[in-house]
């Protein structure tokens, strides 16, 4: 578990109030701490499996299929080998090592502007107590 100082809520607040480049330039050390905290918190696969289980019970077949398809045999790769984070507006982007897959966390029930590069995307809308909706496109 990460220090609450570097919680998702804090990152969402930062992401919603700052420009990406300005934030990175002015907060490089803090950026690294946040990134490492997230990686530390999710380096075990619990969240990966929880999300997979959620997808199987989701009532929307299209979303269920999309999530399970993306996560099949790749849960740890997607969630446990995240290498860096990018902020843009109110959205928080996690990129996987080769940057072909990324995960978007948002505190708002909406999607970021498209297009964004990457062949797979998972939108994860985050509430205070955790995940409540994810969609892959």
Give the residues covered by each predicted segment.
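N-terminal export/targeting and maturation segments
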Residues: 1-77
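Extracytosolic and intramembrane catalytic regions of membrane-associated proteins
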Residues: 42-137
